[in-house]
Amino acid sequence: MIHSNSKIYVAGHNGLVGRAIIRELKKKGYKKIIAADRQKLDLTNQISVLRFLKKNKPDFIFLAAAKVGGIYSNNKYKADYLYENLAIQLNVINGAYLSGVKNLIFLGSSCIYPKNSKQPIKESYLLTGELEP
């Protein structure tokens, strides 16, 4: 349960999912929403992330940040996407742990489900078939 006076950090607040989270939080009356764009915080920089979290002391983190692109870009730059996204995830999750954040919600990608998955996708379909390359 997120209390009305909780400090909430939304990593990836400029993306599709992050914007929706911010919109919903504001609609529900949350006032202490923390966000930082790439110019203010490089999520691939472990030290910067830890400093940011220790300074801001969020009660909750929504991890919706990721390097994204289309299927063509994902295929062409596979290692780059994997490296940057793993760095973001590791830095935010470890930074949350080291700075004492008690609640973190990590949002994954639909690409971990089979590319021809029956709709609507069920959680049990996770990694049960061929994925997008």
What are these regions (language model features)?
Residues R23-K27, K54, N94-L98:
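Short, well-ordered alpha-helices that flank and scaffold nucleotide-derived cofactor binding pockets
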